Every structure is written in structure tokens, then in C-alpha cells.
């Protein structure tokens, strides 16, 4: 142990503790004090630090070097004791500068992203076989933020207090500049910018800076990174897949494609690009950089998962400035899709809240609901804050539901409010981290899910087969299931399984049925045809105020009306099979006139189809006038509206399945082909009924690349134009030349064991439980959005709790 001793005033701070680790690694004796003792202090104590709780002059060892930071008052008892004793006093930034003298220093500064960029650079160097020293403003996976190594030293340089004037690094990164900590610069942005400019000129080799930032670009010299085409390291593309991002960059005429990093959000792609630029400047090879970024373990309190439950997600993030909050929530939204995002925000410092009040309320657009709690003062004097007015501003400007809940009541409120599938994000640089710890093992109550099947349509039996298959994939960890069977006569039965009695059903108004229906949280309608798939059931569920899965009222009504679908799509330039609508009134008035019009429009064979039934119900292939007449009469027995369609016999039947919100996040399964024994695939062959083999489903569809892309593009266009919701299957006819026509839309596709809908998504990498979850998530989101417009349940609950 070296004889020299260092004493830290405020050793539990993230910046101070990093330097304490380095000094301990180098053999120095270290002591320190702080106003509280947390995990950081506990780690240092286990490493040999002598810790004192509170600030008292007797804590300062004789002849020690006393380290202080910008937040330490000159009236601090230990600071005064060091002055009186003649101890050497050194600012944290000066000590950091001294510690880096014998190594190649890489300093990262800027308003946002310092910790992530410095952590990424450190991990890349470690992957390259180096053992860098590092002093970082966040804990790694091992709970360490500082370490002494050799050759390289990676550190954060705090731009907030002007202390970066102490550094002259070999390499540097300036991530960005924001109106943050301006009070330390007399409110003058130019003084902050001048300090960064001075820092860049003192960089001895290369200063990497954000080339997308016009303020930096106007006054700095160095290498740029960013999405702007003039950047030296130009980010050409990026995409996010779940909790990973992929980006392509060009640097010095070399293209680096699909670089993967275990981070989310455009801001983190920028951070990864900055780290990659530094690594390339150091001569580190591409494979090493890729491997390091792909395996990057992350930093604690940077979208760190805190809970153990599998039915909801609780994340913690250090974001406390409005721009950080906005980036974090948008990244989470991209990762979790339609799941409800509940942001819990603890504003950091009264002064920062006041400085950022102009942009703070609009920072939460990526969330669905926001819980605002008490400001973390960070040592500042308490100020009056109208949390009610601030919550109203957030609701208005971010278009979310927002409520204030006192910090002491947060845990209890969340335990009542968190719902299966929720994603909670605790935001702040204060002590909001205790929330994640307290909810680590919390489990929300299961969702009560009501599965409705059967129905009055002629597809009653297929509905039950679909329900029986789907029921196998309703996870008992997520749902308590109540089954509702609608008889062919429109009566209802209910039970805890699909093995329902043969007794006559009851009306929907029966106390047992109505009572059970009122208690479920969300409805899963597995219904085909009229009264279930055509908007009737959807309208009923909206009227009684129940969330439901699958298509919305409007999408179901349009999708199940084949003529209306054809009219809309034809008007929008999408090819449809030529058709002629026929009304019951017109047919009854003058059959001969109708037949003449039909034969003038089409030649035999042709098809007679019911407007509101499934893809193979009420469909008749006809070859002469007598068959045509009989088929029309039969079709009108099944439906009030009929249409005649030109034959597409000989064409292939190609289908594309969808999940999600056509105006937001949705998923497309790869196309598949349905092949029959020859000719039209009727209802019996489609589902393998009456002892017949079901139609063959082919997933590796043999179509030209051009036709595939065009057909998928049109299918997606249809789903978007109709603002598809929940689920659907869109069917096409494709001829040998690659021409195709829209056939129809199925809002609730068959989900039997023989149906391709579930299998199509399984081939895409989903499992069947995930498909059910997605249906539920979309249904809940759609309901929540409508509820926000007519009520504010979160605010009401918060007020009631007070």
C-alpha cells in the first residue's frame, strides 16, 4: 500500500467513486464521507475504503489529499478542515487529469450520451485484448464504474461546470450540445459552446463530434459522425428489431453494413457510431468492433430491467432532461410496439425543471400514461411546484394520460395499476431507483379473458374448432379464461372450459351471462361470419365498454362486406376481380333482367358469392343459366346481398396474414398458397370436413421476386388504407403471368389446426402464445386510446387515492 492517502468528500457520487476505485487499484489508501450509504459505498467499503457517514472535520485524515467536486460547498466542514490543516485540496477534474497522464486518454463529453459512449469504447478496447483504465458515470454489469488498467484511459469529461478545461486528451468525443446546465455559464449558450471548442482544440490527436449538430459543426474541427451525408463517419441506415439496433456506416470509403448493437433508439445508434469512430481511429479491426457492440452488456440505470416477472416489464433509466426522456421513451416504444408504456417520472432538481419547463411537457409522447412524482432536489432548496398544472400540461402537450402521485405513494399505486403486458419505465437521476427494487418480485393480477365462440352464422362449427385450438395457447400465467358459447339460435352458455353442457342457452340479459361478461377484462371473439366477424359483435362490445381483440367495428364491417371492399379498393387503384352486385329486391322484381345483365357482363363459368359470408361459404361455381339461377336463389337463402364474380379458375390462391394496427405497429406473415385437388376449393375441402382431405397449404410460394414484392406491397397498402386492426387475412388470385387481383378480406381468419393463419406467423419466428398475446395487447391498446378521449381513468384513480 502506498503511503499517500486520498480522502473524498462525497465519495458516494458516481464521478467520485470511479476515481476512488482507480486509486485503490493503484495501491493508495482511500477514505471518504457522504450523507448516505448506498450500493456504491458498500462496494467501495468491501474494497478497503474507510467510510464516514456525514460531514465532520475529524473525518479528514492528516496529510491526506482531499478531493472535492463542484457540488461541494466551500462551507462544508471537511472542506474547511482541509484548509485549516493545510491538506492539499484537489478538484475531482484535476485528479482525473493527473490519473490519465501516463496513458493514452480518450475523453467523452457532451450534454447527453457520455456514459453510454465511454462504456462502449471501454468494452471495444476490452474485446481487443486491452485492459483500459476507465472512469465512467454509470455502473457496468459488475457494479463498477472505475478501474485502473494500462495503455488506454477512457473517461467522461463533465461539460456542465467548465471543468473540462483541465483536460488535454489524445482522443475525444463530443456527443452533442443542449441547453443543459446553462446556469453554470451565466445562462449564456455561447460560453458553453466556447468551453467545448477549447476542449476540442486541446485534443492532441482526433476530436470526434456530432456532425448532425449545427452548433458544433459551425465551430469545431475534427472528425464528424452522424446521419448527415457530409459526416466523415456517415450513418446511412438504421433499424430497430426488438431490443437491438442495426446500422450501416461509411467511413474513409469503407462500407460497414448491418452493425449490431444491444441498444435501442436513434440516439444510441449515434452513440455506437461515435464509439466505432474512435475504435477505427485506434486501428481496432472491424470484427472486434462488431463483436463488442453485439455483446455490449449495457450500463446500469440505462433502460435496465429491474423486475423478475414474465408478465410485465419494469425498466429504469437515468433520463432526466426532456430530450433524454423523449429519446428513451421513443426507443422503448419502438421495442415494445403496442404494449402499454407507463412512464414514471421523477423530475431532477427544481432549477432544471424551471429551465426546461418549455419543453418538459412535450417529452412524453412515446408513453401511453405518465405518473409524475415529487422533484428530487439533489440538495437544492425546496420550491413550490404545481404538480396538478404540470400533469395537465403533460397530458395536453404529449397527448397522454398524466397524474401526479406523491413519491411515498408510488409503490402502492403501481401495485394496483400495473396490468399484464405493461412496460413501466422509471425515469430520473434521483432515488427513483428504489422503486424498481421494491417491485422486483411483484406480480400483477391475471387478466380475466372472455373467449366467445360459436355464433349464429353457418360457420358456427369452424368457430368452435378455432376456439378449441386457440384455447391451448392461452397462458395460465397471464390469463384466467371464461368461455362463452353462442348457440346457433343466438343463446349464450358460459363456463370455465369449452366442455359446456348440452342444456339450452340463455339470453345475453340473463344475470349469470351478463354478470360473467361484466367481470372479464378483455374479450377474445373467435367468431366467423355474420353477427361475429362483421362488426355486430364488435359494436356490442364497444357499447358495453369492453376491450376486445381482433378487428375493430369499422374494419370488420368493411372487411366482411365483399362488395364494399371491392368498391373501396377499386377506387384506390387496387386490382379487383370484376364483379356485379345483386340485391334481393332487384332479383325478386325481375330475375330475367338480372340474368341478362349478368350474362352480358360475364361468360360461363362464373361464380355466385354471398357478400357477408366467409371465403368458401355461399360460393357457387356455375356453368349455365339454370345453375346460375339456382345458385343465386341458394345464395339469397344465406345472405341478403349477393354478387357475381368473373371466374379466376386456374389462378393460384395466395394469402397474406396480418396482426396489429394498420395505422401504427403491425406485422406481416410471409405469403402462403392454398392448393386444392383442382378447381374451386369449397368449404368442406378448405377445412377438411366430411372425411375430405383439407386443401394443401404451401408456405414456400414459387413466385418471381417482382411479383412477390408487388403483391406484398399491395397487401400492406390495403391493410393501411382500411386502417386494419387486430388481425386479418387478405386473399389474392394470381395468374401464370404474375398478374393478381384482390379476392377478399377475412377480418377473423380461421384458427383451426388446419388453418394457415397461426402457422404463417410461427414460420416467421413467433410462437402461438405470442400471437394470442399480440391480439390481446392490440385490443387493450385500442380500448385505452378510446378511453383517453372520453375519460381520464388514471387521473380519477390518483385523485380517489388521495
From Swiss-Prot:
For this chain, the family text in UniProt reads:
In the N-terminal section; belongs to the MurCDEF family.
Q: Which cofactor does it need?
A: Mg(2+); Mn(2+)
The record's Gene Ontology biological-process terms are: cell division; cell wall organization; peptidoglycan biosynthetic process; regulation of cell shape
Which cellular compartments is it found in? Cytoplasm
Cellular component (GO) terms are:
cytoplasm
- Protein name, entry field: Bifunctional enzyme MurC/Ddl
Instruction: List, alphabetically, the Gene3D superfamilies matched.
Output: 3.40.50.20, ATP-grasp fold, A domain, ATP-grasp fold, B domain, Mur ligase, C-terminal domain, Mur-like, catalytic domain, NAD(P)-binding Rossmann-like Domain
- What organism is this sequence from? Chlamydia muridarum (strain MoPn / Nigg)
- Among the Pfam families in the record, one is Dala_Dala_lig_N
Which residues are noted in the entry as Mg(2+) 2-binding? 744, 746
Which EC number(s) does UniProt give? 6.3.2.8, 6.3.2.4
Amino acid at each position: 500500500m502506498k503511503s499517500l492517502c486520498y480522502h473524498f468528500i462525497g465519495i458516494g457520487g458516481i464521478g467520485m467513486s470511479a476515481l476512488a476505485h482507480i486509486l485503490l487499484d493503484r495501491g493508495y489508501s482511500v477514505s471518504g464521507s457522504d450523507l448516505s450509504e448506498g450500493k456504491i459505498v458498500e462496494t467501495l467499503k468491501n474494497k478497503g475504503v474507510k467510510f464516514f457517514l456525514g460531514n465532520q472535520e475529524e473525518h479528514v485524515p492528516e496529510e491526506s489529499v482531499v478531493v472535492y467536486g463542484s457540488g461541494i460547498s466551500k462551507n462544508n466542514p471537511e472542506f474547511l478542515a482541509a484548509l485549516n490543516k493545510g491538506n492539499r485540496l484537489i478538484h475531482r477534474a484535476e485528479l482525473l487529469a493527473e490519473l490519465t497522464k501516463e496513458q493514452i486518454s480518450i475523453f467523452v463529453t457532451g450534454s447527453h450520451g457520455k456514459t453510454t459512449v465511454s462504456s462502449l469504447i471501454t468494452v471495444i478496447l476490452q474485446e481487443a485484448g486491452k485492459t483500459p483504465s476507465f472512469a465512467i458515470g454509470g455502473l457496468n454489469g459488475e457494479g463498477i464504474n472505475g478501474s485502473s488498467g494500462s495503455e488506454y484511459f477512457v473517461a467522461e469529461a463533465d461539460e456542465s461546470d467548465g471543468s473540462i478545461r483541465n483536460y488535454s486528451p489524445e482522443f475525444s468525443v463530443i456527443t452533442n450540445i443542449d441547453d443543459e446546465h446553462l446556469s453554470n455559464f451565466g445562462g449564456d449558450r455561447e460560453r458553453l459552446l466556447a468551453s467545448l471548442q477549447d476542449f476540442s482544440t486541446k485534443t492532441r490527436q482526433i476530436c470526434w463530434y456530432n456532425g448532425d449538430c449545427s452548433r458544433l459543426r459551425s465551430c469545431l474541427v475534427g472528425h464528424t459522425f452522424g446521419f448527415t451525408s457530409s459526416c466523415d463517419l456517415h450513418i446511412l441506415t438504421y433499424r430497430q428489431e426488438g431490443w437491438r439496433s442495426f446500422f450501416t456506416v461509411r467511413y474513409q470509403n469503407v462500407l460497414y453494413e448491418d452493425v449490431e448493437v444491444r441498444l435501442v433508439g436513434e440516439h444510441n445508434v449515434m452513440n455506437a457510431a461515435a464509439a466505432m469512430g474512435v475504435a477505427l481511429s485506434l486501428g481496432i479491426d472491424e470484427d472486434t468492433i462488431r463483436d463488442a457492440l453485439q455483446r455490449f452488456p449495457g450500463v446500469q440505470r440505462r433502460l435496465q430491467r429491474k423486475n423478475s416477472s414474465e408478465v410485465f416489464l419494469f425498466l429504469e433509466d437515468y433520463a432526466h432532461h426532456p430530450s433524454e426522456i423523449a429519446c428513451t421513451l421513443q426507443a422503448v416504444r419502438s421495442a415494445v410496439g403496442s404494449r402499454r408504456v407507463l412512464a414514471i417520472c421523477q423530475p431532477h432538481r427544481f432549477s432544471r425543471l424551471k429551465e426546461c419547463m418549455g419543453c418538459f411537457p412535450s417529452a412524453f409522447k412515446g408513453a401511453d400514461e405518465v405518473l409524475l412524482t415529487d422533484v428530487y432536489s439533489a440538495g437544492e432548496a425546496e420550491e413550490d411546484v404545481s404538480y396538478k398544472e404540470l400533469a395537465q400540461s403533460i397530458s395536453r402537450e404529449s397527448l397522454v394520460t398524466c397524474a401526479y402521485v406523491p413519491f411515498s405513494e408510488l409503490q402502492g399505486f403501481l401495485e394496483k395499476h400495473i396490468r399484464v403486458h405493461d412496460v413501466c419505465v422509471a425515469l430520473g437521476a434521483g432515488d427513483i431507483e428504489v422503486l424498481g427494487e421494491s417491485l422486483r418480485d411483484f406480480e400483477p393480477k391475471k387478466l380475466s379473458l372472455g373467449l366467445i365462440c360459436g355464433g349464429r352464422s353457418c360457420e358456427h362449427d369452424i368457430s368452435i374448432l378455432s376456439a378449441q385450438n386457440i384455447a391451448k395457447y392461452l397462458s395460465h400465467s397471464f390469463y384466467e379464461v371464461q368461455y362463452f358459447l353462442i348457440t346457433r339460435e343466438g343463446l349464450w352458455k358460459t363456463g370455465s372450459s369449452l366442455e359446456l353442457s348440452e342444456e339450452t342457452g340463455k339470453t345475453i340479459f340473463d344475470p349469470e351471462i351478463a354478470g360473467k361478461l361484466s367481470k372479464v377484462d378483455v374479450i377474445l371473439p373467435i367468431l366467423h361470419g355474420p353477427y361475429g366477424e362483421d362488426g355486430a359483435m364488435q359494436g356490442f362490445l364497444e357499447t358495453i365498454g369492453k376491450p376486445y381483440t381482433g378487428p375493430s367495428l369499422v374494419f370488420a364491417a368493411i372487411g366482411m362486406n365483399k362488395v364494399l371492399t371491392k368498391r373501396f379498393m377499386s377506387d384506390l387503384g387496387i386490382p379487383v376481380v370484376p364483379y356485379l352486385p345483386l340485391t334481393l329486391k332487384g332479383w325478386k322484381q325481375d330475375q330475367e333482367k338480372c340474368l341478362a345483365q349478368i350474362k352480358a357482363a360475364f361468360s360461363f363459368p362464373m361464380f355466385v358469392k354471398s357478400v357477408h359470408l366467409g371465403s368458401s361459404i355461399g360460393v357457387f361455381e356455375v356453368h349455365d343459366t339454370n345453375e346460375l339461377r339456382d345458385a343465386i336463389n341458394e345464395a339469397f337463402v344465406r345472405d341478403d346481398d349477393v354478387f357475381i364474380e368473373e371466374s379466376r379458375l386456374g389462378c393460384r390462391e395466395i394469402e397474406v396474414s396480418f396482426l396489429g394496427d394498420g395505422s401504427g405497429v403491425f406485422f406481416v406473415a410471409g405469403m402462403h398458397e392454398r392448393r386444392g385437388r383442382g378447381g374451386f376449393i369449397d368449404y368442406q375441402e378448405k377445412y377438411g370436413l366430411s372425411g375430405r382431405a383439407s386443401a394443401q397449404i404451401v408456405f414456400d410460394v414459387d413466385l418471381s421476386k417482382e411479383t412477390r414484392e408487388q403483391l406484398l406491397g399491395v397487401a400492406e397498402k390495403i391493410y393501411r388504407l382500411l386502417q386494419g386492426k387486430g388481425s386479418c387475412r387478405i386473399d389474392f388470385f394470381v395468374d401464370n403471368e404474375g398478374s393478381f387481383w384482390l379476392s377478399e378480406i377475412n377480418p377473423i381468419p380461421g384458427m383451426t389446426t388446419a388453418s394457415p393463419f397461426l402457422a404463417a406467423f410461427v414460420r416467421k419466428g413467433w410462437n402461438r402464445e405470442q400471437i394470442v398475446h399480440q391480439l390481446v395487447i392490440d385490443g387493450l391498446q385500442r380500448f385505452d386510446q378510446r378511453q383517453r378521449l372520453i375519460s381520464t381513468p388514471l387521473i380519477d384513480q390518483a385523485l380517489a387515492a388521495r
